[in-house]
Amino acid sequence: MAKEIYRRYMWLTDTIRSAKNGITFEQISSKWQRCSLNIKGEELPKRTFRNWLNSLPTALGVVVECDKKAPFRYRIANREIERNDLLEWSLNAMALGNIISESNDIHDRIMVDDIPTANETLRIICSAMRNCHMIWMHYQPFDTDYDYSFNTKPYAVKLSGNRWYLIAHSDSHNRDFCYGLDRILEVKELEETFQMPKDYSAQEKFKYSIGIYAGEQLPIEEVKLKVSGYLQDYMETLPLHWSQRVVERDEKSTTYGYTMRCTYELVDKLTGLGSFCQVLEPLSLRQQVRENALKIAEIYK
């Protein structure tokens, strides 16, 4: 029951935030009648609507305001929630789920990428994170023939490249390690507790990198990419990194600037963009991408 109520809160939040100019109760009720969560297609009682609104600040941290004059449109008051990546991702995922549910008659024409399932593993890890409990896990890496078991401190989880990853801290190595959830054979939440460092921030850890490798030992550098062709529009609508900015633009190309760490994941990403992306700076990154390109060219000789 609690899960269903939470989904309704998510639906209401997404419905209101999607209305750029606000939305009336009548419009919300009409959308609710067509919503996949409303199996019987009933109208939304105003009392229920009020209860949902009153619960949003506690449940999701969302505050809704209403215009003081007709037609009394509702809108999100604290737009800063859009900077909450987890809430934003959850709302988008739920909205997509509703769209697919309402389009069952064309389900064979709606395609999504497969994400390795690790729901139970993710649930156990998130529970341990909330409780600051150690976890025991049995792990099988991709690059070895053996598996091993150990205790560790679950600090954070991250979704990257259609895979969930655990960032966990090892006291014996005095560093964080990254584990693919689909490679965890078994995981248990332990009673043993740990203290999260007061200054730890997963967002800050990955602030200057892409993917799952933070590369904190690498310097933060200014990166310049010269992008041409279709890739200009693509990167304009889906930036490579939050620090992306336009440095120069002409009829044929756009030069973007970034503040990043030049990790191996960045090198691989830029190599994959092919001839439409040229690294201008730094020289070391340009050389790494060049070496990758030469290796690929050698394969296809």
Regions found by a protein language model. Name each.
Residues 7-15, 91-95, 267, 271-272:
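Short, hydrophobic/amphipathic alpha-helical patches that form generic packing surfaces
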Residues 12, 49, 132, 225, ...:
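A residue-level signal for conserved active-site and pocket-lining positions in enzyme catalytic cores
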Residues 109-224:
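Core beta-strand-centered patch of the WYL/Sm-like small regulatory domain
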Residues 64, 157, 246-247:
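A structural signal for short hydrophobic beta-strand segments in well-ordered beta-sheet cores
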Residues 25, 54, 60-61, 65-141:
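Bulky hydrophobic/aromatic content
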Residues 1-87, 295-301:
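Short, basic/aromatic recognition patches that contact phosphate-bearing ligands
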Residues 73, 136, 165-167, 255, ...:
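General beta-strand recognition
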Residues 205-301:
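Polybasic (Lys/Arg-rich)
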